[in-house]
A protein has these predicted regions:
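C-terminal-biased regions
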Residues: 1-83
Length: 83
């Protein structure tokens, strides 16, 4: 997933969380999304936030969004690792 695809998918994911009124996951993600400059430290924080949402708030997110969340987390971690 390239950066453009990542940003499109992340925007759709955040929009879906807003529609669900999933305040817990939004509280974790919104301080890190959208990124201001896309620097490595921002990618690290976003990857960490995505992981936190996946682990701590899974019960508030439907299965199809969990798949998107896992994909976003993997892509953010890959961006940090330069893959």
């Amino acid at each position: 997933m390239d950066a453009r695809q990542f940003h499109e998918e992340a925007a759709l994911f955040v929009d879906a969380l807003c529609e669900l009124k999933a305040l817990g996951p939004l509280r974790v993600l919104l301080p890190h999304w959208p990124m201001s400059m896309g620097l490595t430290d921002e990618w690290v924080e976003l990857a960490r936030a995505l992981k936190t949402v996946r682990v701590q708030h899974a019960g508030q997110i439907p299965e199809e969004l969990m798949d998107r969340l896992a994909s976003l987390q993997h892509a953010a971690e890959s961006a940090v690792n330069g893959q």
